[in-house]
Swiss-Prot record:
Annotated catalysed reactions: a D-5-monosubstituted hydantoin = a L-5-monosubstituted hydantoin; D-5-benzylhydantoin = L-5-benzylhydantoin; D-5-isobutylhydantoin = L-5-isobutylhydantoin
Species whose genome carries this gene: Rhizobium meliloti (Ensifer meliloti)
Taxonomic placement: Bacteria, Pseudomonadati, Pseudomonadota, Alphaproteobacteria, Hyphomicrobiales
Record text on subunit structure and interactions: Homotetramer.
Protein name: Hydantoin racemase
Activity regulation summary: Inhibited by Cu(2+), Hg(2+), Pb(2+) and Zn(2+). The activity is twofold lower in the presence of Mn(2+), Co(2+) and Ni(2+). The insignificant effect of the metal chelating agent EDTA on the hydantoin racemase activity would indicate that it is not a metalloenzyme.
Keyword annotations of the record: Amino-acid biosynthesis, Isomerase
Stated family: Belongs to the HyuE racemase family.
GO terms of biological process kind: amino acid biosynthetic process
Temperature-related properties: The activity is gradually lost at temperatures of more than 30 degrees Celsius.
Site positions for Seems to be responsible for recognition and proton retrieval of D-isomers: C76
Site entry (Seems to be responsible for L-isomers recognition and racemization), positions: C181
Listed SUPFAM superfamilies: Aspartate/glutamate racemase (SSF53681)
Entry-linked Pfam families: Asp_Glu_race
Length: 241
């Protein structure tokens, strides 16, 4: 099976980090590749960044469809363009937020999410509600660190995350922690060992979920909601399924 990971932002080093996390957990017979658009924001921090990232991400999926990709992972915790991506792809499309939340609800009764900036908190709160986890998610927290700073100063990021995890355990009663940014994936194992609480990385969760769905023979339903887009002209261009 071939799983393609798409980082919707244009920072190639972040794409490489997410791919490294995926390669560590994939099945021996699974092929995982990765890419990112080159004309999208360097990081996705808010609704405007999300909107600007979606056309490039959909183009990556269309290219993957032509190459025979079986499933896709959208490696941004805001799950930008997830529903649109499922319209374009034949196989499963997994958002890392949805995957991480599903894992958290499966292995714990209550969990907290820790993300980068405070402006991302309401976006993630809405996603948690959409995914049916509002009763289980005790709090969405932020370490007030920009996404790109996770790579620029990983030691500081780790210190801030460790502190916030301990607060979440004490104040939220969190039994598991979800890392709310793909750029945190490389820190997951160390954070779990240091805090003694399950720490869930969405990239890992999404790759394993994609493998499970493909192994069971599931594809994206093309009945109504996720049917292929109708072909039509748009500003002189043809919108292709």
């Amino acid at each position: 099976m071939h799983i393609h990971l798409i980082n919707p932002n244009s920072t190639a080093s972040m794409t490489a980090q997410a791919l490294e996390s995926a390669l560590l957990v994939k099945h021996a017979h699974t092929h995982v590749s990765a890419s990112n658009p080159t004309d999208t924001p360097a990081s996705i921090e808010g609704g405007a960044d999300e909107a600007m990232s979606v056309p490039g991400m959909l183009a990556e999926i269309r290219q993957g469809e032509a190459q025979g990709v079986d499933a896709y992972v959208i490696a941004c915790f805001d799950d930008p363009g997830l529903h649109a991506a499922r319209e374009v792809a034949k196989g499963p499309v997994i958002g890392i937020c949805q995957a991480a939340v599903q894992v958290a609800m499966t292995i714990s009764r209550r969990f907290s999410v820790i993300t980068t900036l405070p402006r991302s908190v309401p976006i993630i709160e809405d996603l948690v509600s959409d995914y049916g986890a509002e009763r289980h998610c005790r709090k969405v927290r932020a370490i007030d660190l920009p996404v790109l700073a996770l790579e620029e100063d990983p030691q500081r990021a780790e210190r801030l995350l460790l502190k916030e995890i301990e607060i979440a355990k004490a104040e939220d009663g969190a039994e598991a922690i979800v890392l709310g940014c793909a750029g945190m994936s490389s820190l997951c194992d160390r954070l779990q060992k240091a805090t003694g609480v399950p720490v869930i990385d969405g990239v890992t969760a999404a790759v394993k979920m994609a493998e499970a769905l493909l192994g069971a023979g599931y594809a994206t339903s093309k009945v109504n909601t996720y049917a292929y887009p109708r072909i039509k002209a748009a500003a002189g261009h043809k919108v292709c399924a």
